[in-house]
Curated annotation (Swiss-Prot):
Name of the protein in its database record: F-box protein At3g57580
Domain of life the protein comes from: Eukaryota
Source species: Arabidopsis thaliana (Mouse-ear cress)
InterPro entries to which the protein is assigned, alphabetical: F-box-assoc_dom_typ3, F-box-assoc_interact_dom, F-box-like_dom_sf, F-box_dom
Residue intervals of the F-box domain: 4-53
CDD domains membership: F-box_AtFBW1-like
């Protein structure tokens, strides 16, 4: 038999199973090799299968901000599913430069929202897919400079929405246009250092109001925004007022489908420094019933001596803490509240520059990241954001809202 003429035809189901185990970037490359593969790998059935397989291997997503270089870099690593894992390797995905403003980003279902990125002398709101680097710009709105905005996902209509103060923009609705929402609510100011959290189609974020007199003249409240109905509710959060001077200590998390608030502090335990973690869980959102848990983490010299933040809570219930700045070695910590165990995993691969003290970057980490091919195929996202620094004024139309393509 002439092996050069040998033609082996694989069943379509087998092709789907093989490719569903690959990274999304590899799938994108194989789509270009033949019309048959492109048809299979762009089908709705394969997109659903890929998402199902990807959900079984969640990752940690890292967005690293380098102030000195005006640059964001995006990495991901396997999320620990084995108590005996000691290290994990990063995969670099994309980056963008161009006078990055020191504003915190917002994350929702695989996309990142940046409220102020300077591109070609223009301040632009940018939504970016950190894996592919594809992005789009949104119309700029007149608002309070302290406002930061959020990106949220509507699980009912399967659409993303951008939300800033009382303005809402729906992606996938044709023209990208902000709508103003009149809200009968107390005068409040969002805590700009807090990213908020979206849980089952409801956005929660921390804010301050002056309605109730306190020793500081302010009190905390939590704003609750239903993404589908676009209705607001307000949750009394005065129990956190002793953190008013430093709200950065508080993190909102998705704790097993319920709103959680965490606060970490180093304490002296028998002459040794250790970390105390407080967790409040909103057990009943209608009755506003909170349950508080206090954990003293197992002794860990690295954790007790470094700056860290709470990245979130995994679907399996592990509370993930990560070092706040890149360095070598860099660690992520998994605390299991039920077993009272603390797992330390070294994250390798930020690169020599980011690991230098003088060039370190601030790390924003997100748990349970899952690759979704439908995000990679979104026509509204344009060319790679890594190229924005090279845009000249005559190419500025690439990021202007009126020139954004049709929406899927």
């Amino acid at each position: 038999m002439d092996r050069g003429k040998m033609n082996v035809s694989l069943p379509t189901d087998l092709i789907r199973e093989i490719f569903a185990r690959l990274p999304s970037k590899s799938v994108a490359r194989f789509r270009t090799l033949s019309k048959q593969w492109a048809s299979i790998l762009r089908s709705t059935d394969f997109t659903k299968l890929f998402l199902s397989r990807s959900s079984n291997r969640p990752r940690l997503l890292f967005a690293v901000e380098r102030y000195k270089c005006n640059e964001w870099q995006f990495f991901s690593s396997p999320q620990s599913q084995n108590r005996y894992e000691k290290s994990a390797h990063l995969e670099f995905h994309s980056k963008f430069s161009g006078d990055v403003s020191h504003y915190i980003c917002s994350y929702a279902s695989g996309l990142l929202y940046f409220p102020a990125v300077h591109i070609v002398d223009t301040e632009t709101i940018v939504i970016c897919n950190p894996i592919t680097g594809m992005y789009t710009g949104l119309p700029v709105i007149m608002k309070d400079r302290r406002s930061r905005g959020f990106l949220v996902f509507d699980p009912v209509d399967k659409r993303f929405k951008a939300f800033d103060t009382h303005f809402i923009l729906t992606l996938g609705s044709g023209e990208l246009k902000w709508r103003e929402k009149n809200i009968p609510c107390p005068l409040y100011e969002r805590c700009s250092s807090n990213q908020g959290i979206c849980i089952n189609g409801v956005l929660y974020y921390l804010a301050k109001t002056v309605l109730v007199e306190t020793v500081f003249g302010l009190t905390f409240l939590i704003v609750r925004f239903d993404v589908s109905s676009e209705e607001f509710k307000f949750i009394d959060a005065a129990r956190f007022n002793d953190r008013l001077k430093d709200p950065t200590r508080l993190s909102l998390v998705n704790y097993m489908g319920k709103l959680g608030v965490t606060d970490c502090n180093c304490v002296d335990a028998g002459g040794r420094r250790t970390v105390e973690l407080c967790l409040w869980v909103l057990e009943d959102v209608e009755k506003l019933e909170w349950v508080k848990y206090v954990y003293t983490l197992p002794e860990n010299e690295v954790l007790a001596s470094c700056e860290f933040s709470v990245a979130g809570v995994t679907a399996t219930g592990d509370i993930v803490l990560c070092m706040k700045y890149t360095c070598k070695p860099y660690y992520v910590f998994y605390f299991n509240p039920e077993k009272k165990t603390l797992q330390t995993v070294e994250i390798q691969g930020f690169g020599a520059k980011l690991e230098e003290v003088e060039n370190r970057g601030e790390v924003f980490a997100y748990v349970d990241y899952v690759e979704d091919l439908s995000l990679n195929d979104a026509k509204q996202l344009k060319s790679s954001i890594s190229h924005v620094k090279s845009l000249c004024p005559c190419c500025q139309k690439l990021v202007q809202p009126e020139n954004i393509g049709e929406v899927v």
